[in-house]
């Protein structure tokens, strides 16, 4: 049955136009006048944890969380069991997606077998079914291995999406090697452990012509390297997360919900990421939604597993923290959270929309999340842009908590 919303601000051709009515299928949500209808959000970096770790999250709960945050397409990372390094292993995940996903899910195949960095995965067999290839959770340590992966990905027309981390520079660190780590006796992770591999890979991407994407950029030097590579014609894009744009190591608390990889960096790094988002060096925002069990996140900064959740609060926190403060236009936020990721990874997002009430206020409450994960550094934040509904392929999926 067709329904409609009246008096909406509709995103069209890069700007907002006023529409008297907006039609869709499903039960109409209860909303105020002048809500904003934007293209469905797209997240190219999500951990759905299934198969292998369904005590943390499932495809069903993860995509429900995505829909509750306005997302209509996500790309799932390959650190699973089995690792999708052959078509047979990938099919295990594809079958679950077909059965349980509420929205579009495009998985990544792994770059190397078992994400061990030793031999290439069966990329040819997986190519028709994946968004690209990544060893996310681990960096490809071997330059030779990454070179071979890029050559093969180039021939297949696929993106290499790289988790950039030099294991030789970690030294057991788990938060940023900055003032907080020094003051509180924590082991730090250097910025070079990220930007070093990025510099290496940018050279390889220039040589091979491979479409190269950098995951979860967190340092100022990384942004500068990518900016210069773009100017020289390298086919590179990158993402950063909401937490890197809005928080830094000065915001750390002795709580597992502040622990992720890469870690929250310095204020200068945060500011450089915002500048990169403004000038287009940082192409897109991805949450790196990485749920863990409550027990796994209850061991403080030193003992908790790395990873936070973000699908259900990303748009409100970024709207409040960047748009309302004048750092980014609403149109640019839509570009970074929907259009750019869909364009880079060839994602069909037609007839998919997210509806937000920009004036509605809410407090981020993880206990109300659809996700099985609860660990977010944004818990308790007072934000605007409450989610009203998500329309997937023309039909309303999720009304939102204020409907």
Please give the residue ranges for each predicted region:
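A glycine-rich helix N-cap at a beta->alpha junction
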Residues: 95-111
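C-terminal cap of metal-dependent C-N hydrolases
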Residues: 8, 300-303, 351-403
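Metal-associated gating/positioning segment near the N- to mid-region
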Residues: 35-100
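Histidine/acidic residue-rich metal-binding segments in metalloenzymes
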Residues: 120-285
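Divalent metal-coordination and catalytic microenvironments
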Residues: 8, 21, 34, 45, ...
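N-terminal metal-binding scaffold of metallo-dependent hydrolase/deaminase domains
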Residues: 1-30, 35
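His/Asp/Glu-enriched, well-ordered alpha-helical/loop segment
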Residues: 183-209, 278-279, 283-285, 290-356
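Active-site mouth loops of central-metabolism enzymes
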Residues: 44-57, 78-80, 106-119, 137, ...
């Amino acid at each position: 049955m067709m329904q409609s919303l009246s008096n909406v601000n509709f995103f069209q051709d890069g700007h907002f136009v006023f529409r008297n009515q907006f039609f869709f299928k499903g039960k109409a949500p209860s909303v105020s006048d002048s809500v904003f209808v934007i293209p469905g959000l797209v997240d190219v970096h999500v951990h759905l944890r299934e198969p292998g770790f369904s005590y943390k999250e499932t495809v069903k709960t993860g995509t429900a969380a995505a829909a509750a945050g306005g997302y209509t397409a996500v790309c799932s990372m390959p650190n699973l069991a089995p690792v999708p390094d052959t078509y047979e292993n990938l099919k295990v995940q594809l079958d679950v997606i077909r059965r349980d996903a509420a929205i579009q899910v495009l998985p990544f195949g792994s770059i190397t077998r078992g994400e061990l960095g030793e031999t290439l995965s069966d990329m040819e067999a997986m190519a028709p079914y994946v968004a690209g290839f990544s060893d996310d959770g681990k960096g490809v340590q071997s330059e030779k291995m990454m070179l071979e992966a890029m050559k093969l990905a180039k021939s297949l027309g696929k993106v290499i999406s790289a988790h950039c981390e030099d294991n030789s520079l970690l030294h057991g660190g788990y938060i940023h090697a900055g003032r907080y780590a020094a003051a509180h006796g924590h082991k730090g992770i250097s910025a070079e452990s990220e930007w070093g591999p990025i510099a290496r890979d940018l050279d390889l991407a220039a040589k091979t012509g491979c479409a190269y994407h950098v995951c979860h950029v967190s340092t100022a030097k990384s942004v500068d390297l990518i900016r210069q590579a773009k100017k020289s014609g390298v086919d590179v894009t990158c993402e950063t997360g909401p937490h890197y744009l809005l928080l830094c190591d000065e915001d750390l608390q002795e709580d597992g919900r502040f622990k992720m990889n890469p870690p929250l960096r310095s204020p200068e790094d945060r500011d450089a990421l915002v500048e990169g988002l403004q000038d287009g060096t940082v192409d897109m925002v991805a949450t790196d939604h990485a749920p863990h069990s409550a027990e796994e996140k209850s061991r403080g900064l030193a003992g908790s597993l790395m990873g936070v959740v973000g699908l259900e609060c990303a748009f409100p926190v970024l709207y409040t923290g960047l748009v309302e403060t004048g750092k980014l236009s609403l149109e640019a936020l839509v570009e970074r959270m929907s259009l750019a990721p869909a364009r880079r990874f060839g994602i069909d997002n037609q007839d998919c929309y997210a509806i937000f009430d920009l004036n509605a206020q809410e407090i981020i409450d993880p206990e109300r999340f659809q996700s099985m994960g609860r660990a977010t550094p944004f818990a308790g934040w007072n934000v605007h842009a409450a989610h009203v509904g998500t329309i997937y392929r023309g039909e309303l999926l999720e009304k939102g908590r204020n409907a």
